[in-house]
């Protein structure tokens, strides 16, 4: 994980950044319950360790909605799609932002109860997900768990024919 110097600007001075490794300590051994919705009536509540990487949340969301993990993804912590202010992108698309989902933990992303943020999957089709932290639980979970599910997810490739 990055320290303040690695996150610094070209002069080696640390940037002011809400995404700080120091936030991780008070969330050790805890988990988030995050509501992830695609559209009205279709959502999943996912419990995931506060210590999990953002890429693990990405995988949990894709699995929860039955999508294939075959496209780029990003998280927008300021709740604005395509914002470059507080965003995390998958490795390989760093042109969009310097923070990658495989290097930052949820505990470093400034999450707390009530925090809303966006998740974008497939930059071409733009599958947009609204995320909201419902609670911070005192117990940790080893792997992400779907604790509530409502509605049927749309097909990822509705016009794709098996030939």
Each model region followed by its residue ranges:
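Short linear regulatory motifs enriched in tryptophan with gly/pro/ser
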Residues: 1-163
């Amino acid at each position: 994980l990055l320290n303040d110097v690695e996150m610094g600007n070209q002069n080696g001075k640390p940037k002011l950044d809400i995404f700080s490794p120091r936030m991780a300590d008070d969330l050790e051994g805890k988990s988030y319950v995050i509501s992830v919705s695609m559209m009205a009536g279709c959502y999943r509540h996912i419990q995931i360790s506060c210590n999990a990487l953002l890429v693990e949340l990405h995988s949990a969301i894709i699995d929860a909605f039955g999508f294939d993990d075959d496209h780029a993804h990003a998280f927008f912590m300021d709740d604005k799609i395509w914002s470059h202010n507080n965003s995390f992108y998958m490795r390989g698309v760093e042109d969009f932002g310097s923070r990658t989902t495989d290097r930052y933990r949820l505990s470093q992303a400034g999450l707390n109860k009530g925090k809303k943020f966006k998740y974008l999957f497939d930059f071409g089709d733009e599958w947009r997900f609204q995320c909201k932290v419902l609670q911070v639980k005192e117990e940790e979970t080893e792997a992400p768990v779907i604790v509530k599910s409502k509605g049927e997810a749309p097909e990822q490739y509705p016009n794709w024919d098996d030939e």
